């Protein structure tokens, strides 16, 4: 999964 990783990085 990368949703969490992307969300965190986006923040």
Swiss-Prot record:
Optimum pH is about 6. Activity decreases sharply with increasing alkalinity. Keywords: Antibiotic, Antimicrobial, Secreted. It is found in: Secreted. Disulfide bonds: none annotated. One of its GO terms (biological process) is defense response to Gram-positive bacterium. Optimum temperature is 30 degrees Celsius. Active from 30 to 100 degrees Celsius. Antimicrobial activity was completely lost after treatment with proteinase k, or high concentrations of chymotrypsin, trypsin or pepsin. Also inhibited by isopropanol, methanol, acetonitrile and chloroform. There was no significant loss of activity with either lipase, peroxidase, or amylase. One of its GO terms (cellular component) is extracellular region. Has antibacterial activity against L.monocytogenes. This is Antibacterial peptide AN1.
């Amino acid at each position: 999964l990368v949703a969490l990783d992307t969300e965190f990085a986006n923040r």
